[in-house]
């Protein structure tokens, strides 16, 4: 039990160290803990979208759900989505990825500093387990723009709903005005 408590304190310490500074202050003295943390799920819980972190199929693949049609593709190093919803098409850039197993979700910056959880997620499980596919976050519901569950509504806003628990060293600078 004592070892578990010590390990938890070490992980909490390292999480604050990694988030609070980009230098090697913590890592130089705590190499084993650093190594353990880098191999943990927490190290991969949220990351900038890039070729190393994005698991979803962005090879011009289409996913549809009721009135939504998403086309996932790449341009240079950017991961893009054309979302057609109720006849209107908009292009979005994936800013961040959330998670890796068994699914990966994507954060879209819809306006400066305002991040929303995209309405489709990637099932990262192996194909023989039903994975390697896009699916709607609310599979059995046609979520309309005025619905509280719609991806552009406050319940799907990373800044207000997700950031407190899913990020470290959070500084709130987003202003709705």
What feature does the model see in each segment?
Residues 1-7:
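Positively charged n-region of N-terminal signal peptides that target proteins for export
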Residues 7-17:
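Bacterial N-terminal signal peptides
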Residues 18-22:
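Sec/Tat signal peptide C-region and signal peptidase I cleavage site
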Residues 23-35, 39, 159-172:
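Detector for the c-type heme attachment site
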Residues 39-49, 177:
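Short cysteine/histidine-rich metal-coordination sites, predominantly Zn2+-binding motifs
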Residues 44, 61, 65, 127, ...:
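Short secondary-structure junctions and interdomain/linker hinges
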Residues 52-74:
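Short Fe-S-cluster ligation motifs
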Residues 75-177:
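Extended surface/linker regions that mediate inter-domain or inter-protein docking
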């Amino acid at each position: 039990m004592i070892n578990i408590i010590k390990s938890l304190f070490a992980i909490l310490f390292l999480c604050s160290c990694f988030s609070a500074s980009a230098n090697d202050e913590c890592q130089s003295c705590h190499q084993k803990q650093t190594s353990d943390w880098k191999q943990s799920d927490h190290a991969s819980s949220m990351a900038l979208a890039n070729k190393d972190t994005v698991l979803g199929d962005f090879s011009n693949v289409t996913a549809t759900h009721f009135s939504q049609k998403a086309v996932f593709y790449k341009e240079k190093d950017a991961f893009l989505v054309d979302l057609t919803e109720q006849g209107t098409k908009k292009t979005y850039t994936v800013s961040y990825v959330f998670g890796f197993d068994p699914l990966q979700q994507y954060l879209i910056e819809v306006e400066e500093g305002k991040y929303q959880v995209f309405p489709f997620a990637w099932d990262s499980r192996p194909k023989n387990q039903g994975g390697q596919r896009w699916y709607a976050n609310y599979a059995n519901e046609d979520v309309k723009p005025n619905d509280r569950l719609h991806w552009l509504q406050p319940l799907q806003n990373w800044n207000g709903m997700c950031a407190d628990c899913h990020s470290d060293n959070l500084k709130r600078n987003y202003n709705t005005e």
